Structure formats: structure tokens, C-alpha cells
Swiss-Prot record:
Residues 20-39 bind DNA. The keyword Thylakoid does not apply. It comes from Escherichia coli (strain K12). One of its GO terms (molecular function) is transcription cis-regulatory region binding. Residues 1-60 form the HTH lysR-type domain. Keywords: DNA-binding, Transcription, Transcription regulation. Belongs to the LysR transcriptional regulatory family. The gene is yeiE. The keyword Transcription regulation applies. GO terms for biological process: DNA-templated transcription; regulation of DNA-templated transcription. This is Uncharacterized HTH-type transcriptional regulator YeiE. NCBIfam families: PRK10837.1, trans_reg_YeiE.
């Protein structure tokens, strides 16, 4: 059996795109070359990797079994190439919203000041998206706002972060200490399910309320801040996210009858991920002692 990296690359691209036509475009190969590589791979394995449904290719149980192993081999092949040009490859980072928008930019700025020639790719999504990208080897390192339970991922505590309940300055809740009943009766504007912030808010805060009124779910923190500022409800986000608005007086902190709402931010990478010298150097800049507060 002589399975090639090209065959695995074709297989992975066909699975992602769902057709040999689109895969041929992404790989800059002819459609016949893509089809031949896929047929050869299935022949060597002695199984079909896709079910043919009309003109579509739908991955089956054999393909699902092969896919993570193919990705790992392709990633290792890239790492072999990078061993000889360690400082030339882009560092691929995926961070959840609070971290990617409010913490990492200052870290990356310091790194780029010292190493201006080295590229960095930063993507921002919710914590579930970050974990999936790490599992798929699409990024080198991830930063998330809640715990990760996958056995394929190594999670390391990174920073402590405080969550703050806040309202518009004109809200009655901003005028003094409030009760849990008042919090339960207020309209809440929260991050979407799947975000690390939402998971922690549900656990640390909302679990203490007898009930709560969900007014709105929004997909990013900036939208939540604007909605709260215009009096549409109250919310809970990282102090780092609303610090400027609190100081400017456009938002007000609500004094809740609970201990400080603290959470741990996590750094994650795939268990089989090779940490290159360039990546380790960047992680030195991410040391908690070096991260601006």
C-alpha cells in the first residue's frame, strides 16, 4: 500500500467542499486528477469513503474515520517543511471574542514590534469555534473563555478575568445595591449560546436567580454594549470589555449581591500539535506577567 500525501490532501478537500469540482479549484488541479486521486485512495484502502448521492459526495463512516488521521498527517508534513524555515511560517491564532478583541491585540503589537517580519494570523469567534479549529488543525493555538473537555486538546489556565453586571447610567439598577429579585426581573441582553462568556454567566450568575427575563441574544460584545447603553436591558461582560465605557460614564456597573464574578481564560492546543520555536517565542509574550491589564 502506498498512500500519498496528495491523495490525503484531495480526500480532505473533497470532504470539506462536498464535490470534486470545488476541490479541484481549491487545489489547482484538474477535476479528473482529483477524481483519480480519490479513486486510487479508496482502492488502496478497499472501502468507499463517500456515498455518491446524485452529483454530490457525502462522507460515510469510513471517511469520517479517516478524516482526523489524514489531517494529522498533513499537519505533520507541514511541520516537517517548517523545521527548515522555522521563522518564516505564519503563526495561526484563534481566540474567542473577549480575548481576540480586547487582550491579544496589545500582545501581538509587542511581538510585531520586536519581530516585524514575522506574520501572525488572528481569527476571532466564539469558544466552540475555537475548539473545533484546534481539533481540525486549522490553527496553531487557541484562547478560550471557558473550560475545554476534549481529550484531544491540552488546556492550560492562562489569565483570571472579572465579569461585571452593567446597565445604562439612567437605569434604576445603577443607583445602588440591587437584590437577586430585581436582577431576575430585569431584561437581560446576553451573548449567544456557544460563547465562553455566556457559559460562565449562566453558571456564575444566572444560576443564582429564581428566574430571569431574556430580552435579546447578540453575537458580539460591541452590539451588547450599545444595546445596554440605549436602555434595552442589562448585561454581564468582562471588565476589560467595558472598562473604557465605565470610566467615561456611558455605562454603569451594577452592584450585585454576590461574590466577585471571576473566571479563568484558557490557552489550548491539539495534543498532537508540534509547538515550533516561533510559536513558543510568541507564547512567551503571552505569559500572564507580560499581558497588559
Amino acid at each position: 500500500m502506498h498512500i500519498t500525501l496528495r491523495q490525503l490532501e484531495v480526500f480532505a478537500e473533497v470532504l470539506k467542499s462536498g464535490s470534486t469540482t470545488q476541490a479541484s479549484v481549491m487545489l489547482a488541479l484538474s477535476q479528473s486528477a482529483v477524481s483519480a486521486a480519490l479513486t486510487d485512495l479508496e482502492g488502496q484502502l478497499g472501502v468507499q469513503l463517500f456515498d455518491r448521492v446524485g452529483k454530490r459526495l457525502v462522507v460515510n463512516e469510513h471517511g469520517r474515520l479517516l478524516y482526523p488521521r489524514a489531517l494529522a498527517l498533513l499537519e505533520q508534513a507541514v511541520e516537517i517543511e517548517q523545521l527548515f524555515r522555522e521563522d518564516n511560517g505564519a503563526i495561526r491564532i484563534y481566540a474567542s471574542s473577549t480575548i481576540g478583541n480586547y487582550i491579544l491585540p496589545a500582545v501581538i503589537a509587542r511581538y510585531r514590534h520586536d519581530y516585524p517580519q514575522l506574520p501572525i494570523e488572528l481569527s476571532v469567534g466564539n469558544s466552540q469555534d475555537v475548539m473545533q479549529a484546534v481539533l481540525d488543525f486549522r490553527v496553531d493555538i487557541g484562547f478560550i473563555e471557558g473550560p475545554c473537555h476534549s481529550t484531544e486538546i491540552i488546556s492550560e489556565p492562562w489569565l483570571e478575568d472579572e465579569l461585571v453586571v452593567f446597565a445604562a447610567p439612567t437605569s434604576p439598577l445603577a443607583r445602588g445595591p440591587v437584590t437577586l429579585e430585581q436582577l431576575a426581573a430585569a431584561p437581560w441582553i446576553l451573548r449567544e449560546r456557544g460563547s465562553g462568556t455566556r457559559e460562565i454567566v449562566d453558571y456564575l450568575l444566572l444560576s443564582h436567580l429564581p428566574k430571569f427575563e431574556m430580552a435579546m441574544e447578540l453575537g458580539n460584545s460591541e452590539a451588547i454594549k450599545h444595546a445596554v447603553r440605549h436602555g434595552l436591558g442589562i448585561s454581564c461582560l468582562s471588565r476589560r470589555v467595558i472598562e473604557d465605557q465605565l470610566q467615561a460614564g456611558t455605562l454603569s456597573e451594577v452592584a450585585v449581591p454576590l461574590p466577585r464574578l471571576m473566571r479563568t481564560l484558557w490557552r489550548i492546543h491539539h495534543r498532537q500539535k508540534h509547538l515550533s520555536n516561533a510559536l513558543r517565542r510568541f507564547l512567551d509574550y503571552c505569559d500572564p506577567a507580560n499581558v497588559p491589564r
